């Protein structure tokens, strides 16, 4: 095992992965400390899912709810009625990390956390109509020291503060995770109610089609929320979700509620002023077929031939291209890929890629503002569509369709869209899913699509022990 010297925050020291046991990453979620967060790559050592990030005990935090932004450090709580993205600049002043000379490591400490979908009300003039059922913050972002796992090279990097002490940081981290235990036995309630009946959802689709026909918008995502009882800790649910639904970008965030995400979709990446977004529109569910890649490609071709899905994908790519153009150098924005097939465990997606070169005067918070929330989970045009979503969906979306990721000290950012999304809160499990609606959508089919997306998540939490859960559709 490689030794790891205790250094200043400006020094990242590598540790061989064998300094941890196999269950360490599971126990990282079960932390007795405050604000534990885990951003994890599960689908392999590709460039897009190379690193997993573990953070504990923030140096300073910024939280926003409604019109109030709270900046918190170890000594004080400062309330500021301001744009929460601007507040990130203030929380960065609490840290003292200079970027290291390890240029290959993009995240060397910084602000990590999430922005709920509803934070858009602070960024755009959007009416407030939906019921605020979930009371979590609209933004929860903090500065952290961190542990970084490189899947490609099987190396752990530890970033530690100057005052951490004399113990080898690898030993300190190993002592921490080995002190935790994990119990995989828990129950999920037999029935999950929905905030839509099938008739009400179909009526919502019809109303959306009226808006589409009048030219208010060109495509929209309509979501429904499921809720049921659980007897489990949120970290237990996360580990079960990770096993049942592995994805390139997974997240566990302990900020008031337990937020659990398995996302295949990047909303915005900035590496050395190179911008990248990867919208997903088009999904093939079920594990890869026995016929192999050729049969799967045939299924993808069939999907591409569906006019409704083709129209949806083209509109979303155009929306993301416009978002990148707001912060990109003129003439640099390119659609690098459109409708490419990517395979994951249990699902295949049709993915596009839009890139551009960042304008020199643009800061990290400006990038988030330009691309938030992701167009695949709102619709086009974005602001008008969000107003209509607020009118039709019974509750606010909260974290669903928001974003999770980081802004690094060195200036780069990486955020993913929070889909699929589970919340564990006060003995209840909330699950939210939706689907894209266009002019030729069939209301009953749209209801079934969104309902089954939620059911797939809930069933996945039970598959590990072979339990049978009766799912309900409230009529």
UniProtKB/Swiss-Prot annotation:
Its cofactor is Mg(2+). Pathway: Cofactor biosynthesis; tetrahydrofolate biosynthesis; 4-aminobenzoate from chorismate: step 1/2. Transmembrane segments: none annotated. Keywords: Folate biosynthesis, Magnesium, Transferase. It is an enzyme of class 2 (transferase). The keyword Transmembrane helix does not apply. Signal peptide: none annotated. GO terms for molecular function: 4-amino-4-deoxychorismate synthase activity; magnesium ion binding. Pfam families: Anth_synt_I_N, Chorismate_bind. Its EC number is 2.6.1.85. It comes from the Bacteria. InterPro entries: ADC_synthase, Anth_synth_I-like, Anth_synth_I_N, Chorismate_C. The keyword Thylakoid does not apply. It catalyses: chorismate + L-glutamine = 4-amino-4-deoxychorismate + L-glutamate. GO terms for biological process: folic acid biosynthetic process; L-tryptophan biosynthetic process; tetrahydrofolate biosynthetic process. The catalytically active amino acid residue K274 of the E.coli enzyme is missing. Belongs to the anthranilate synthase component I family. Part of a heterodimeric complex that catalyzes the two-step biosynthesis of 4-amino-4-deoxychorismate (ADC), a precursor of p-aminobenzoate (PABA) and tetrahydrofolate. In the first step, a glutamine amidotransferase (PabA) generates ammonia as a substrate that, along with chorismate, is used in the second step, catalyzed by aminodeoxychorismate synthase (PabB) to produce ADC. Monomer. Heterodimer consisting of two non-identical subunits: a glutamine amidotransferase subunit (PabA) and a aminodeoxychorismate synthase subunit (PabB). This is Aminodeoxychorismate synthase component 1. It comes from Streptomyces lividans.
């Amino acid at each position: 095992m490689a030794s790891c010297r205790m250094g200043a925050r400006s020094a990242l020291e590598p540790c061989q992965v064998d300094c941890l046991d196999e269950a360490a990453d599971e126990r990282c979620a079960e932390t007795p400390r405050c604000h534990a967060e885990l951003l994890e790559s599960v689908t392999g050592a590709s460039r897009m899912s190379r690193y997993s990030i573990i953070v504990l005990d923030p140096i300073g935090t910024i939280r926003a709810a409604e019109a109030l932004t709270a900046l918190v450090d170890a000594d004080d709580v400062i309330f500021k009625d301001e744009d929460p993205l601007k507040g990130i600049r203030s929380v960065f002043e609490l840290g003292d990390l200079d970027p290291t000379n390890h240029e290959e490591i993009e995240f060397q400490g910084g602000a990590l956390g999430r922005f709920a979908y509803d934070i858009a009300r602070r960024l755009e003039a959007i009416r407030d109509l939906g019921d605020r059922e979930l009371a979590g913050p609209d933004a929860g972002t903090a500065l952290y020291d961190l542990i970084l796992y490189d899947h490609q090279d099987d190396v752990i990097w530890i970033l530690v503060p100057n005052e951490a002490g004399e113990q080898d940081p690898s030993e300190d981290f190993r002592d921490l995770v080995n002190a935790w235990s994990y119990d995989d036995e828990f129950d999920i309630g037999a029935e999950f109610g929905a905030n839509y009946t099938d008739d009400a959802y179909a009526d919502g689709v019809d109303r959306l089609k009226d808006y589409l026909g009048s030219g208010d918008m060109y495509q929209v995502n309509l979501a429904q929320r499921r809720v049921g009882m659980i007897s489990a800790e949120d970290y237990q649910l996360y580990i079960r979700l990770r096993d049942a639904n592995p994805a390139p970008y997974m997240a566990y965030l302990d900020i008031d509620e337990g937020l659990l995400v398995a996302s295949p979709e990047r909303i915005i990446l900035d590496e050395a002023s190179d911008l990248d977004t990867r919208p997903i529109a088009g999904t093939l569910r079920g594990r890869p077929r026995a016929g192999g890649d050729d049969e799967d490609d045939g299924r993808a071709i069939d999907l591409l031939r569906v006019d409704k899905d083709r129209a949806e994908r083209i509109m979303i790519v155009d929306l993301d291209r416009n978002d990148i153009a707001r912060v990109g150098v003129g003439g640099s924005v390119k659609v690098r890929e459109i409708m490419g097939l990517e395979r994951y465990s249990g699902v295949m997606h049709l993915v596009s890629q839009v890139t551009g070169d960042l304008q020199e005067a643009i800061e990290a918070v400006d990038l988030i503002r330009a691309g938030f929330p992701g167009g695949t989970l709102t619709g086009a045009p974005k602001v008008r569509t969000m107003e209509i979503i607020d009118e039709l969906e019974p509750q606010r979306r909260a974290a669903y369709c928001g974003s999770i990721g980081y802004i690094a000290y060195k200036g780069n950012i990486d955020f993913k869209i929070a889909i699929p999304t589970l919340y564990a809160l006060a003995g209840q499990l909330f699950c939210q899913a939706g689907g894209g609606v266009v002019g030729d959508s069939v209301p009953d089919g749209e209801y079934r699509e969104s309902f089954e997306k939620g059911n797939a998540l809930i069933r996945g939490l039970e598959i590990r022990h072979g339990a049978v859960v009766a799912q309900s559709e409230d009529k």
